[in-house]
Amino acid sequence: MGARCRSFSALLLLLQVSSWLCQELEPESCSPGFSSEVYTFPVPERHLERGHVLGRVRFEGCTGRPRTAFFSEDSRFKVATDGTITVKRHLKLHKLETSFLVRARDSSHRELSTKVTLKSMGHHHHRHHHRDPASESNPELLMFPSVYPGLRRQKRDWVIPPISCPENEKGEFPKNLVQIKSNRDKETKVFYSITGQGADKPPVGVFIIERETGWLKVTQPLDREAIAKYILYSHAVSSNGEAVEDPMEIVITVTDQNDNRPEFTQEVFEGSVAEGAVPGTSVMKVSATDADDDVNTYNAAIAYTIVSQDPELPHKNMFTVNRDTGVISVLTSGLDRESYPTYTLVVQAADLQGEGLSTTAKAVITVKDINDNAPVFNPSTYQGQVPENEVNARIATLKVTDDDAPNTPAWKAVYTVVNDPDQQFVVVTDPTTNDGILKTAKGLDFEAKQQYILHVRVENEEPFEGSLVPSTATVTVDVVDVNEAPIFMPAERRVEVPEDFGVGQEITSYTAREPDTFMDQKITYRIWRDTANWLEINPETGAIFTRAEMDREDAEHVKNSTYVALIIATDDGSPIATGTGTLLLVLLDVNDNAPIPEPRNMQFCQRNPQPHIITILDPDLPPNTSPFTAELTHGASVNWTIEYNDAAQESLILQPRKDLEIGEYKIHLKLADNQNKDQVTTLDVHVCDCEGTVNNCMKAGIVAAGLQVPAILGILGGILALLILILLLLLFLRRRTVVKEPLLPPDDDTRDNVYYYDEEGGGEEDQDFDLSQLHRGLDARPEVTRNDVAPTLMSVPQYRPRPANPDEIGNFIDENLKAADSDPTAPPYDSLLVFDYEGSGSEAASLSSLNSSESDQDQDYDYLNEWGNRFKKLADMYGGGEDD
């Protein structure tokens, strides 16, 4: 056991020597401290006996004294004055690594520390590593693993502990780190080389190895913040270039030096805290970072402190900062925004737990306002006036003062009218001045109340802090009387009347009342809007009458069976005021519209025609609409059929009964509604030269709904024959024109008691008819009168109009022939005419007894004087009279 301990002590000594080689100091300067920030000591077993030497730490105090007072933070270990670390009692390591701090004091009584790490290596490691306890963690000699004959070597069984080298070393370079040896160097000449980062890979040349001796060296100072660990591979080859060993991995760990100051994440930190905050209230957090090692050293262990506070009122230390977290909180009470709205702190961050390098930053703390000041009215009494009926009228401006921060919830005023149960007033806050603007929320009525005394209370958007009392103001409001417009009662009147309401009848009486009870005013009425001109109003009484027939189906003026008219009432006040009322006439439906088909124009193909759907429309309302009844009239059913398309009988299906000729057809369709209101509508139907559905209709001439081609040819032939007959009669009359003498004598030749007897009937029999009768057709004839004889009253024959149904054309011709035969005025005149009848005997007896004026015999004509005044002239001519 003693030999084993001596061997392990020798190994530790070799490790310590290697560490000294890497920790050379400049001779011209002395900096107190440990030679390394971290010491790593391997232990062969986890069970350590009392007095077991682990290793030795080196401390340079710059005083020349070889011994220094050390102490361990772990009570299980003891550090001698020369830096040797031993186990104080039997110890079992439960972890592969155990770390603790060793502290020492320099000549200025400043405490310094280093970290010691114990690594449990196991038996197989001890077998291949020969370390001196004085050589720290870096062995002086590294041996390639041996391969025993007959055994398969496991590469992972050979573990090389990391080699530590401090960063930022000073002195001459290159410096030896460790020597690498091969067991084959006794058999053959061995040459050594290294590869990896820092050797043949960037950064190239940081580490080199002597080709023959195997010494691994560092060529320049290292920077842990740039590269914290290097992984190299050592190679051993013979003189002919053959590998005598497998490559061995070497890990070089760069130990940290406190060469980086902490850096704040911001130059200026901003935070806020409410005024009046109690001690302990968190305000904000500052943070800093350090690029040094924060795992194995305290070089990045940052501690925060407050260096200064501005202003230092009301206390010097109003805030404190947590050393570890950087959280700034309130230390003492007394924060008042109105006195000190902001504080500026200078915060320091130092590594080595506050003992190392440091830096500073600013922390600006804003004291937030709280509602600790109530708004106050200034002044507290106001007076204003407002005209009645005005809404949103400005009455008065209420002034307040508030010491809280402007434009914050603790400053913004909220006004309330205390004694306003009907909510007739409202106070609006001016966002700029914070003043209260008192307005009317509803129209005031002078006749109801002439003056209001209001109490207005002011508060803030944010609730008061503490026991603050709201301020109150008194406002006196006088209502000014104005002439008010008449008011219709109700403002909208609804009246139901049938649409056939009689013209000139009174519909209703729509009147308004005068709200100004203190004034004696007269109201007149007139219609302001009557788009259909259906109404008129009595200007004195407001009675409304109809002036024209109303129509519910007038879509331009009637919406939803309602006709809207506006009535205005005007008083005679100063100024004149006018009120408006709305009259809603609900027109009750009357069955005044017969149903109509839609569409009325259709096209069918001649071959295999497709049926058409006809929709029945009726603008009336139920029950004056469906179900409808339909019927084809005027013989249309010969060629066409209709049937109902739905159970409600609101649409029809029209289709030809048989194949029809190409052309246009007139179909008479009779439709009747549920109340038997009917109407016959003519449908224009085109039969096209196509099959199935009509795409491009080829039309022919117009064809009657029931006529066939032979019937049409017969009618055309009859018309042609009639035209030829009329032409022949006109030619004949032009050759036999006779000028008739007037039947009565001229006015200047009128003589009493003189008759003309030379008119013998109607002249020649072949000319005794009116030529104008030849131009008459079978329709109604014009009336013929004479001015020489009294007219003879006789019945006018009734001619039947041409039927639309071609099947009735035969009856039409027969009946009209009979009517023509019984018409005495129709040619030819086949009755017996008497030409020698000269009328009955005259009351004046025959004139044949009178002698001619040429007779020589004297005649007595005195009796002519007895015949009266009409024969006086004749008596004077033949009687002689007194002139004789």
UniProtKB/Swiss-Prot annotation:
Residues in the Extracellular compartment per record: 157-709
PTM sites of type Phosphotyrosine: 755-757
Compositionally biased intervals (Acidic residues): 757-769
Binding residue positions for Ca(2+) 2: 259
Signal peptide extent: 1-23
Main subcellular localisation: other
CDD domains: CA_like, Cadherin_repeat
Protein name per the record: Cadherin-1
Lineage: Eukaryota, Metazoa, Chordata, Craniata, Vertebrata
